[in-house]
């Protein structure tokens, strides 16, 4: 990315890697936002996938046209100076909360799947994150390009094995949800992830050579996200008592595709790790704009705060924080829908 303009495939992989974090890769987000509505949740996945493709493209095109260097400039463009600054403060707390969720997810991974202390998992993640952030953002894009294809391949393997070897089909049923709750949940999921992804997508758009590349990258990325979401949904629908697990997808892999269990756990950790690093980068840039302190102190303060918050527990954080963030993010999606993209800059 740094040596030349990015390609559509690079953009797509980073897009997927930005959206796919602890909740997505472990299956908790799929359970909370989609599977609990039965097969109506599958239609919700298609709605979210459409949002990732269309609104993701619009977000990045606007960013390129206004030459936004950070999501703060994007929010000021969408909401105006006063409201934009308020939204930016809100985003500061959102990114901090999501970082706590990612840390808690790492702890749950070590505890539930490896039999180790959750505290060890969180501290290892914190240590690795701080080490990487001393080198800047050079490795962020490379990690996504490496991890995302593996995630897609293993998702396909797991969904195939789970349907071959499982006798359960009870997790997803034709249950009639209350009114349009499944649709609101799907839109909320898309809004949440798009509003968070702007921390990476907004500056990334200026790494692309043209709007054509952006549109193609958004299409590929949105399609890949829809495929991975669908595969995870179908796999989880075969797991008995799916709602009892903090990391249900890892349980599916363990039961029906045991040969790739440890590799999939590594992929989950990779997604958690890249999400933590991305959030750290976005938070540090925002804090630096109003508090000129050395980066290492900001990183340390962020991780200490996130570590304390993560003690609430991964499952509880996902169930309460994510839906709340999603509903508030609807304002961001509404502004993105209503705001007209500025004219293309003349060459």
From Swiss-Prot:
> Where is it localised?
Cell membrane
Q: What is its main location?
A: membrane
Q: Which domain of life is it from?
A: Bacteria
UniProt feature coiled coil, ranges: none
Q: Which residue windows are transmembrane per the record?
A: 6-26, 37-57, 90-110, 114-134, 140-160, 182-202, 217-237, 262-282, 289-309, 317-337
Does rRNA-binding show up as a keyword for this record?
Answer: no
**A cellular component term (GO) from this record?**
plasma membrane
| Topology in the lipid bilayer | Multi-pass membrane protein
Keywords, A to Z, come to: Cell membrane, Membrane, Transmembrane, Transmembrane helix
Matching entries from InterPro entries are given as: YkvI (IPR038728)
Name of the molecule in the record: Uncharacterized membrane protein YkvI
Q: Which source organism does the UniProt entry give?
A: Bacillus subtilis (strain 168)
From the broadest rank down, the organism's phylogenetic lineage runs:
Bacteria, Bacillati, Bacillota, Bacilli, Bacillales
- Its encoding gene is what? ykvI
């Amino acid at each position: 990315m740094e040596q030349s303009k990015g390609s559509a495939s690079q953009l797509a992989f980073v897009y997927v890697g930005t959206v796919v974090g602890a909740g997505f890769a472990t299956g908790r987000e799929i359970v909370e936002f989609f599977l609990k509505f039965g097969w109506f949740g599958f239609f919700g996945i298609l709605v979210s996938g459409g949002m990732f493709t269309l609104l993701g493209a619009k977000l990045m095109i606007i960013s390129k046209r206004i030459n936004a260097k950070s999501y703060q400039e994007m929010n000021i463009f969408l909401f105006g100076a006063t409201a934009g600054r308020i939204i930016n403060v809100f985003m500061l707390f959102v990114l901090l909360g999501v970082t706590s969720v990612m840390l808690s997810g790492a702890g749950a991974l070590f505890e539930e799947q490896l039999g180790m202390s959750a505290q060890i998992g969180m501290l290892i993640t914190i240590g690795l994150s701080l080490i990487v952030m001393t080198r800047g953002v050079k490795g962020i894009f490379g990690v996504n390009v490496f991890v995302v294809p593996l995630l897609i391949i293993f998702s396909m393997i797991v969904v195939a094995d789970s349907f071959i070897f499982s006798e359960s089909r009870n997790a997803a049923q034709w249950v009639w949800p209350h009114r349009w709750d499944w649709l609101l949940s799907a839109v909320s999921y898309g809004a949440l992830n798009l509003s968070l992804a702007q921390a990476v997508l907004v500056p990334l758009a200026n790494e692309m050579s043209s709007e054509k590349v952006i549109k193609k990258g958004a299409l590929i990325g949105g399609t890949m996200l829809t495929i991975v979401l669908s595969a995870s949904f179908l796999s989880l629908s075969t797991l008995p008592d799916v709602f009892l697990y903090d990391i249900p997808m890892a349980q599916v892999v363990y039961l029906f595709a045991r040969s790739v269990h440890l590799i999939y756990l590594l992929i989950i950790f990779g997604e958690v790790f890249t999400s933590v690093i991305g959030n750290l980068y976005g938070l540090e840039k925002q804090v630096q704009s109003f508090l000129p302190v050395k980066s290492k102190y900001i990183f340390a303060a962020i991780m200490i705060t996130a570590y304390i918050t993560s003690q609430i527990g991964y499952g509880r954080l996902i169930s309460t924080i994510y839906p709340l963030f999603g509903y508030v993010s609807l304002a961001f999606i509404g502004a993105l829908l209503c705001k007209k993209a500025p004219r293309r800059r003349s060459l």
